[in-house]
């Protein structure tokens, strides 16, 4: 494997010195880019794009050709694991992801297989290997998975949900069934992320998109507990360097201390958490990633720069900050505004890293 020419992102996650704050964007390979839409049209549909290593590599690289980003993120979907378990993932136009065979009872959970990442999910590993070759050491590659709780929301609800009534019914009426499902998912995620690391992912991230819908007690029992199990099971050294692990619970700002205690290297923040407050609370234990509201990218470039400046000042001097949005970039953001954001982070952050 090639030596990394730019390891700013990996260094920041380990709270090591950098020359400027590294930046990448959640969903940086996506529908806001016309070239992404063109490639997706060639693939035919979203999952065909994910399952074609060459096309997945192409869309992963597209934002890097436009912007001086400090990391690439694997182009895939969090629902690859439930799909590999046989739930029958499909996408309804305007409805998002759906499953043909959602989980309804304990018997459904008991018969779920734990997928072999090099077999049922081999297309993901092929994409990781293809992207690493194409990157040729330019920037690190981030691998990722959904958290067990977040995967369970889709598997039990049968797709996207606003109220999560089916899953919460299971959580309160049949908690042991849900624990069995979450435990199987945690085992699957460990295998999946370790396979991504062996295939070439240099950092991994666990997306807990729906952890924020839980009470504090339930978050610890049904979400954080299983992310902790995953962190404990991950390969943390590969290719002669540490493989940093980032946890991100959207809406989880009140639980940062407990998240930091899992042994992860970094925490993702959404835009509802003040980054100065987060640093005061956990900055001696973990790096922080975030946390500009993605909607700021609708503003003119001068306003975007102002927001970047405010967040940099809020985090303050020193190491341990990876700049990002607080969630994924919106599909109708002008590409030039994303460029203004990336350039502003690099231009304005250097003074915060001078000794």
Swiss-Prot record:
Pathway: Porphyrin-containing compound metabolism; protoporphyrin-IX biosynthesis; coproporphyrinogen-III from 5-aminolevulinate: step 4/4. One of its GO terms (molecular function) is uroporphyrinogen decarboxylase activity. GO terms for biological process: protoporphyrinogen IX biosynthetic process from glutamate. The record marks 77 as: Transition state stabilizer. It is found in: Cytoplasm. It comes from the Bacteria. Catalyzes the decarboxylation of four acetate groups of uroporphyrinogen-III to yield coproporphyrinogen-III. Homodimer. This is Uroporphyrinogen decarboxylase.
């Amino acid at each position: 494997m090639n030596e990394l020419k730019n390891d700013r992102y990996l260094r920041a996650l380990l709270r090591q010195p950098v020359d400027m704050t590294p930046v990448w964007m959640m969903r940086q390979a996506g529908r806001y880019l016309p070239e992404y839409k063109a490639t997706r049209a060639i693939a035919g549909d979203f999952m065909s794009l994910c399952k074609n290593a060459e096309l997945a590599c192409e869309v992963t690289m597209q934002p890097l050709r436009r912007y001086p980003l400090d990391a690439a993120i694997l182009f895939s979907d969090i629902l690859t694991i439930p799909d590999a378990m046989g739930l029958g993932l499909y996408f309804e136009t305007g409805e998002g992801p759906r499953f043909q065979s959602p989980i309804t009872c304990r018997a459904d959970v008991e018969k779920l297989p734990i997928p072999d990442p090099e077999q049922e999910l081999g297309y993901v590993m092929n994409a990781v290997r293809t992207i690493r070759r194409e990157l040729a050491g330019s920037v690190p590659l981030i691998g990722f998975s959904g958290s067990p709780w977040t995967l369970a929301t889709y598997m039990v609800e049968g797709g996207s949900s606003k109220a999560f009534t089916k899953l919460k019914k299971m959580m309160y009426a049949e908690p042991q069934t849900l624990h069995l499902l979450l435990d199987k998912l945690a085992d699957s995620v460990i295998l999946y992320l370790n396979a991504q690391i062996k295939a070439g992912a240099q950092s991994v991230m666990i997306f807990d998109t729906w952890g924020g819908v839980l009470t504090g007690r339930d978050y610890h029992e049904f979400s954080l507990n299983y992310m902790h199990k995953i962190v404990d099971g991950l390969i943390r050294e590969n290719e002669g360097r540490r493989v940093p692990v980032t946890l991100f619970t959207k809406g989880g700002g009140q639980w940062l201390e407990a998240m930091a205690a899992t042994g992860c290297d970094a925490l993702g923040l959404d835009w509802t958490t003040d980054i100065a407050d987060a640093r005061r609370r956990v900055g001696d234990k973990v790096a922080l990633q975030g946390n500009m509201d993605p909607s700021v990218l609708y503003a003119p470039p001068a306003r975007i720069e102002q927001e970047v400046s405010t967040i940099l000042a809020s985090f303050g001097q020193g190491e341990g900050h990876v700049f990002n949005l607080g969630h994924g970039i919106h599909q109708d953001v002008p590409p030039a505004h994303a460029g203004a954001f990336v350039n502003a982070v690099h231009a304005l952050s250097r003074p915060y890293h001078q000794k």
